[in-house]
């Protein structure tokens, strides 16, 4: 085969990128080659070139763990930092953070929750009534309402990461669809984290099981998944792409909490498929649901 490396320097907007006509540019580059596969090349770059293995020896932590926990605590309770908002939905008060980034149909009214487990953990550790009474009940309601209810064709799936309080609807960031990995993240992992602390919450457990069953129904015979499905017609979308994402992990969570063998078997099928199609090839698909699932930060 042929190699055709492409180099860009300087990067626009970064140091050294402002040039005048006639200026000269000097830069160096390194080419590393191996016949041992992408992972060995990756390790070489990480450890031999960038020296990541020495980072802990060079690190001097000055902020103790309890100070970090206090910072999270303050952040959650300070509305000016967390952009906390409550809103009505189907007779319930739901709570989340304002999200002012780009969301389809949003009019600066998108809300979402992140780090669900951290919030419940902090409340469990501190017993702070401001958390247990003023935050968690409304975050719980948000998670319950985010999920498609019984009777809906998408029952068990998260209907969108974001709630638009002006339109009173849940939406995805970009697109009118549901994603199997969205079930893993926003149903199984989020509800699973809450259930670690609220084991007797029957509504949450019922919603969790519905999510696990929905994910199971979407797994293909070879262990993989479609990237997304239309909300209204249930047809697979982005069929030119493979779901090269750890969607199968939702089954691991389901098995841990529900203890049923079918979820473990599904996790193994999914993991085997993921290794064959993603890990062995050094390939992945982005998880943000943006720009046709480009290789984003996730």
Outline where the language-model segments fall.
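Extended amphipathic alpha-helical coiled-coil/heptad-repeat regions
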Residues: 142-286, 293-297
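Carbohydrate-recognition beta-sandwich/jelly-roll modules
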Residues: 1-213
